[in-house]
Amino acid sequence: MSNNRRQFLKNSIGTAAAAGFATFPAIANMPVDSTLKNGKNKHWVWINPNQKEEVAVLKKRYKVFYDAGIRGILFEADSEKHYTEAKNAGLEAHRWNWTMNRGDVLKQHPEWSAISRTGDSCVTKPPYVGYYKWLCPSKPEVQDFLKNEADTILSKKYIDGLHLDYIRFCDVVLPLNLWDTYKLDQRTELPAYDFCYCKTCRDAYAAKTGNDPLSLRYPDAQVSWRLFRYNAINNVVNQLAVVAHQHNKKISAAVFPIPELARRMVRQDWTNWNLDMVFPMIYHGFYQEKVAWIGDAVAEGVRFLEDGVPLYAGLFLSDFNNQSELASGIKYALDNKAAGICFFGGVTDEVLATLKQATS
């Protein structure tokens, strides 16, 4: 994970994911009536692989992961060494790839940038933080680039699947915990954070409706304009799904925690994506919610998904005050029919012990 993204997370909850998960007292014996008892759940971890680590270290770590119930890893970078050792330990190894937030791409193609309602490019005026450099999903050139990139990634035999991150528009509404940090009141949509109003999007919307979105009196309330943005991202995802399935490999995505929030905050209509599995980031601290909300979020997501599409509950380890809270979060997720858990943050031996005990 980049230092910029770590800082964004740090600002949101007052502690950095980079610091990992604090050491807590051992978890008390607590009964957990979870679906893992039937042996059908599997659990995941988001990891940025350290290229300098020795193979012996990786062999040991990934065996420990497997023994604790982890069955898959989402790697934020390419590393044949890491992927191979994970697979040797019995784990799936997927490439976690930033999709629409791509400053690296905009350096070469600034004309592909999303444009805000105020007319600003992410290249010259990125919203919120300097690394927020968003592509426009409506541009055919962007779609082709992303498909070619996916094809290149999935052509590698040691990669089992593609995991999409930042597969959305910029946050038109931030999680509640960030409003004070950025001194914003986002009870209404602010034009500087509302995307995309580039010529490609405006012309395409006008062709469908006869209206330029910039001429709309209340663009934040215009249902057809919202749907246009939902479908722009849906189209990108579903094209990438075709590429993945041509390789007979899986495709998944990290998404906002519940369908209603995802659509409202980032134009992300993830229940209409052709994914093999979905990973809602149910980071309860970001939304100033209690641990029990994890169960509510899982239940809502499961209700909206088609039968057979597994939902893995993404848990942000720094949101939990102690191991008992973490065990409760795991229980809430699994009792509401999550297919498993995915950890984000420093996965320590204590975290693995909690997972193993809470699901035994």
Question: What is the meaning of each model-derived region?
Answer:
Residues 282-283, 287-289, 312-359:
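Substrate-binding cleft of secreted/luminal carbohydrate-active enzymes
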Residues 24-42:
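C-terminal segment of N-terminal export signals and the immediately downstream linker at the start
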Residues 127-275, 283-288:
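Polysaccharide-binding and catalytic clefts of secreted carbohydrate-active enzymes
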Residues 7-29:
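N-terminal export signals
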Residues 94-152:
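Active-site-adjacent "subsite" loops/lids of carbohydrate-active enzymes
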